[in-house]
Amino acid sequence: MNGNKDSGSNKELAATFTPAEIENRLYKKWEDAGYFKADSKSKKPPFTIVIPPPNVTGSLHIGHALDHTIQDLLTRMKRMKGFEALWLPGMDHAGIATQNVVEKQLAAVGKTRHDLGREAFIQKVWQWKEESGGVILDQMRRLGDSVDWDREAFTMDANLSKAVLTIFKRLYEKELIYRAERIINWCPRCLTAISDIEVDHKDDSGEFVSIKYGDDDVNITIATTRAETMLGDGAVAVNPNDERYKHLVGKKVLLPLVDRMIPIIADELVDPDFGTGAVKVTAAHDANDFEMGMRHGVELVIIMNEHGVMEGTGTKFDGMDRFDARKAVVEELRKLGRVVSEKRPYVHAVGHCQRCETTIEPRLSKQWFVKVAPLAKAAADAVRDGRVKIEPEEMSPRYFEWVDNMHDWCISRQLWWGHRIPVFYGPNGEVIVCGPDEQAPAGYTQDPDVLDTWFSSALWPFSTLGWPADTDDLKKFYPTSVLVTGYDILFFWVVRMMMMGLFAMDGKQPFNVIALHGLVRDQFGKKMSKSRGNTVDPIEFMDKYGSDALRFTLARGANPGTDQALAEDWIAGSRNFATKLWNATRFAKLNGATVEGELAKRSDLNAIDNWILTRLDQVIASADELFEKFEFAKACELIYHFTWDDLCDWYLELSKATFAGDDAAKSQRVLGEVLDQVLRLMHPVMPFITEELWCNLTGKESLMITDWPKSDLSSQDQESVELVNMMQEIVTEVRRFRNDQGIKSTAKISAKFIGLDKVGLSDYEPSLRHILKCEDKSANFTAKTQIGQVIVEFDLTGAIDLVAERSRLTKDLEAAKKDRDTAKVKLDNEGFMAKAPMDVVSEIRLRLTQTSEDIERLTALLEKLPK
């Protein structure tokens, strides 16, 4: 890319890598230089990601850290590939969560929102948002997010509010929004309907009670965990194929306590094997019962108010809390002899409000709904016909399972903070919907409810680009390129964006690819939760190990759609990797590595240089392909092992003799080239350390505005690869020999290499001697080892105590033979074999194999010792 001029920063690197010293400085440098900004007028091809907007109340958790690492990785890579890359940031107003925060502040001074009134309360929330909200935005900077801050959006911004009003009116005019009584999730504490995603299902130890309905003429026994709701029963249901109850279908039965006659109906929904096979139908207080009740015309009897208190039953239970009423109803039924079977423990999942942990009450309520059938079909078709691709593909069935079976979406919330529903009611029952810049006639009152937070966030991919106006941003950056998010909100958010995007944008999908990642779990694979005490704070990890270490750890564990475990030791390991890279660059600079000038022709380079360049091309090609396929874990693993193993452990060590010699220039240029390309390749994952090292190595302005590395697989040098492979075999065998002989790895010994000429390695004896710390000072070579055609002889004089070593090996050999013989005797004993358990026999056989191998190894070591 153009514009990456020499910045004159090519100075000596510090001896140690200290993340805290570089991260804030580099992020400010990038932001001040405008590197994150995207230009809608650019001729470059677009690449767009809109950030899943975190709640304004939130702070960075480990799931965010993974999500943002992947998005930043893709954005930085595409920017380096020449795309006009836009990563658009923002926050969600988080209706119920934010309202709860401010209400708690008011409660602390003895006030409620009703004391302030609606307008004053909303102003109070805005004030809180400006003063305390958005903590996560500063934490995003800590992580290194290269977002276009000039485009930061908020779901309550004026233009996004305009988008909400526009699409609400369009949906209403298409008869895709309607008002009706339905069963919804109701929080008796927050006093609002809440979405499915705001309901946490927890196992609850309830109690099954079997109750006899009816009299001597007609009676039937039902089983329930919610005895209090029987006061609102409208029917009893059985399966039509259940022979036990066929004769009762169509008859009426007496409902105890309220003395109301209710019908016995037959419905396929009833499981004849569950409980007694007969269920009570409380159509106003259970979602399944409501659907069944609609099919059979069952009476809707409301027995509870919005606070979860019994009301309107005409019994002594009115005024009781629902849970107190449950106990009281069972006790009264027992007195009447109606309890057929006493309480039986029953564990089942019960919904709780995510915000306040109150048990959710299914409630019949008049709410606003989106008719999802045509919208969901369009969302399904977009994936089925290939316009939108889901990664990994095996997640597609889960997507279709949801969109093909969606219920209408309840979008109204009984809150004050949020987008107020733009519906107005006239004095004579008129209903009108006002779009942006429209006002209701005098005398009309607006619906008091606000829209579900997910309604406005469903518009995020296009509302943030200026819709409903036909903006340059919308033309350039929509559809967005990829949506990166966890599979856990595939239904709640992703599907809703698909539906709204396709509807608003005339069939244009909101994104081309849905890239789903898994959840971050603890090191044992358990889900993180405050109750388990296994949550982790990414900020603490960044403070301790640096942002790059956390990012690399998360990316290295990110397999598409698969959960990953996280342990602090692994982040420490990534910090060690960063330190390894830092030290390698420092070594390179101290040894004259350069990026100036052309590389020598491959034919003029030695085998070690050709090998590392060949490996570099292979790694660049493979890593690039893996990144594009969202195989981040595999790409990071590949880069890690190339950098640590091939570059640092092999190339640098094998080349030290060359760097110290008179013919170092070509190798210095090769080392500079390899580091240059590796730092580019790693930059999207570890942006801070790579920027610092690359600028120091090259003296140029920024790695962010340079080109992505390209591979040249046509220059592969297989002969050099084979030569270096042979060197690696020699080094590995000699190191093993030294270890077997108890010779310290740092100790120098005399050695003689025989046969290097036969395998083309004569010129590389200095490199082998350097890496193996082998001198050529002796003629008393008394021990040897062989690798193919190459023999290495050693003078062990002074290196080890030969008498003590021979004694140790002989003692170990005798012990191994004794163990072997003992195992053989047992295995040859037919009586023992007939009675011994299989696991014992297997263990003895394994011991025989191991001792036989030990005998072979120890015998060989003794033979190699000088006589």
Place the predicted regions along the sequence by residue.
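Feature 926 captures the class I aminoacyl-tRNA synthetase adenylation module centered on the KMSKS loop
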Residues: G3, S210, E401-F455, L459, ...
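Secondary-structure transition/capping motifs at alpha-helix termini
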Residues: R76-E84, Q105-R118, D138, R142-V147, ...
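Residue patterns forming the tRNA-binding/recognition surfaces of aminoacyl-tRNA synthetases
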Residues: N2-K5, K11, T16, R25, ...
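Amphipathic alpha-helical blocks
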Residues: E21-D39, N241-D242
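N-terminal catalytic cores of NTP/NDP-binding nucleotidyl/phosphoryl-transfer enzymes
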Residues: D39-V102, V164, A223-T225, T229, ...
